[in-house]
């Protein structure tokens, strides 16, 4: 993650408010959610944004609505983008300007091992399955 440009990494099991302080960031991008979700809102500055595109730690979260309206936060789900966004993304990848972070690669026949790794949730990046040439 540091190689991708992060200036600091906080373990998802740590309290971000303790690590960063309250009202420390403008935007939180979260793919985890789960029980520690309210702690993420604590670090967002007034008028800030929270963006999610996943919930691997659990989709049900607790929200104190006062945090939402008193801090004037914007909560956003992100699973769909305009076609031009995807086209631009592909262009960046082809130009090697964006490099996906790959945690592990498994042949399709080892999908069970890939699933075991996914369920452990102790990796950074994507788990890739490769398809045999005779199946393409």
Per-region residue spans from a language model:
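Short beta->alpha linker loops
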Residues: 12-15, 31-32, 56, 80-84, ...
């Amino acid at each position: 993650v540091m190689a991708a440009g992060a200036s600091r990494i906080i373990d998802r099991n740590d309290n971000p408010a303790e690590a960063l302080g309250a009202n420390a960031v403008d935007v939180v991008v979260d793919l985890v959610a789960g029980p520690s979700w309210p702690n993420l809102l604590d670090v967002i500055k007034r008028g800030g944004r929270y963006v999610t595109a996943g919930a691997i730690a659990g989709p049900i979260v607790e929200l104190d609505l006062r945090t939402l309206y008193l801090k004037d936060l914007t909560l956003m789900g992100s699973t769909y983008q305009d076609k031009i966004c995807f086209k631009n993304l592909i262009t960046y990848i082809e130009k090697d300007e964006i490099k996906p972070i790959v945690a592990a690669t498994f042949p399709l026949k080892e999908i069970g091992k890939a699933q075991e790794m996914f369920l452990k949730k102790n990796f950074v990046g994507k788990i890739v399955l490769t398809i045999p040439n005779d199946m393409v």
